[in-house]
Amino acid sequence: MFRPASRCLASRFLAALLAASACFAGPVAHADPVSYHYASVDGLRLFYREAGDRAKPTLLLLHGFPSSSHEFRDLMPLLAGQFHVIAPDYPGMGYSEAPPAERFAPSFDKVTSVIEHFVASLGEPHLIVYMTDFGGPVGMRLALHHPDWIDGLVFQNAVISEDGVDPARRRRDAAITGEATEAKRALAESHVSLATALLLYRHGAREPDALNPDAWTNDAAALANPDSRRIMTDLQLDIPNNVAAFPAWQAWLREHQPRTLVVWGRNDPIFVPAGAEAIRREVPDAAIHYYDTGHFALEEDHDDIARQIGGFFAPVHVRGRIESVEGATVTVRTREGATQVLQLDARTRLAAVKPYDRARLEPGSYVGAAAVPSGAGLGALEVMVYREERRGTGEGHYAWDLAPGSSMTGATVTAVTAEPGGRDLDLRYGSETLRVHVPDSAPVVTYAPAGREDLVPGAYLFAVAAPGDHGQWRAGAISVEKDGVKPPL
């Protein structure tokens, strides 16, 4: 019924065809570079890391204590081929400003407000949110404030219930509940230390002596700053308010049933595996993966966690015929004979295709050719001819899912040779070349505009859909039949 997009390049081909603003991708891609930035948010200088194309689905990474976005240094390059990845440092942590007390009264509500305004300033109203440790309280508050922003959640050692917290830690949290006396503040501050950081990094790790010391060395810089230590101490004192908010977070999860992935270091000294199961109690379809490691699971298992995220949130291809349209809901009978429901929203991009005069195919044309092995070469199933401004879209040769064994080639035509029953196209992408035979029976098309009025029962469509709430699939881009021309992809 569904077919994951094969690679980001294949997805870019589709995105351009649909004139969509998003690039939809499949499995974890090659490493892409991470860039480093500062933003002014609520009068504070906030540091953040960024990777990937902003046209792709956005993955917001919310770090833990006493860490920073440095926690995601290995994860971000692995996901940048599929997602637009952003990872801010909270005020007083990492490279973000640590404002004095008169300028910033730390609490999880306040940190959430800063992150909320940061996300809004980037124009990112839809997010998959990755939460670890302190990221849980921030991410869940963000979800409660803006449920329409949330396209999915990843919990990594971040709790929503008390049974996910080690008993010794629960006793400590109870001891700092209530008015912040000097004794309570001293107890909270005793945990804001390099010793705590080392415990969280090393306890439960498979090979603690093989861990990269850059992690806790980076944290040590913030822990040595008096204003940073004060801010982190204030956040420790605010943890009882997170515990009080657990029922609201659980209710939100039960109501919205977001697409949820749980990746958990089972040897975490403070957040135990019962915390992962508690999430699945609220979201029964949540997927859980345990790792034989500690609190900072990414230190040892970033490769597999990246694979899990990429696979779990990968969009799917839906091909079929519209059965019904009710408001923003489109029901499709897929080509495999199944029923698939698609949800439309303001981000859904619509397009159609129209026939292209194959006699106009000439050297210099930029095309996307879906093909299958035929004889000693490739035989085209269809060819999309791009407008000049779309040159370079999805350039390369890669697997495609139109038919068994099919591939997609985005390339420039270097030669056209007339042959009986069709023509051969010599194609170049980068330094590579190949030949594709285009039979007269293969559709040759180009882009045409379309609107929601073209989504009518009986029309054929090709959609790229991403996971949404309640097990639904949100249509990011749709190519629909128009004027009798069916989308061949």
Q: What do the predicted segments below correspond to?
A:
Residues R12-A25:
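Bacterial N-terminal signal peptides
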Residues D32-Y38, D42-L46, A51-R54, T58, ...:
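Flexible "cap/lid" subdomain of the alpha/beta-hydrolase fold that forms the substrate-access gate
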Residues L61-G64, A87:
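Structural cue for short, hydrophobic secondary-structure segments
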Residues G64-S67, D133:
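Active-site glycine-rich loops that stabilize anionic/oxyanionic intermediates
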Residues P66, P91-G94, I160, G294-A297:
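Alpha/beta-hydrolase active-site loop signature
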Residues P66-D74, V85:
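Serine-hydrolase catalytic-loop signature spanning alpha/beta hydrolases and amidase-signature enzymes
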Residues D285-F313:
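Catalytic active-site module of serine/aspartate enzymes centered on a nucleophile-bearing elbow/loop
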Residues R307, A314-L489:
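Short, flexible, surface-exposed loop segments at domain boundaries
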